[in-house]
């Protein structure tokens, strides 16, 4: 199973865990596995069309999956996924 590192903003949705193990042959399958096990993460990770929410960045072994094959990027048993929500804000 791949390791999925959970950012602080999502930890309440996964019982406070900092990382999880999840199975899947692709990034999409691994993230869907996380969402099936922890339903509160689904709307935080996925848009209504099934793609990643635009403000969620996912890295596979330090490579942005968007420059790889996106949700179709292959994942191996010893790989690590990092979920990193984009931050925005500031004074108007």
Q: Where do the protein language model's features map onto the residues?
A:
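Ubiquitin-like/PB1-type beta-grasp interaction modules and other compact soluble beta-rich domains
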Residues: 1-92
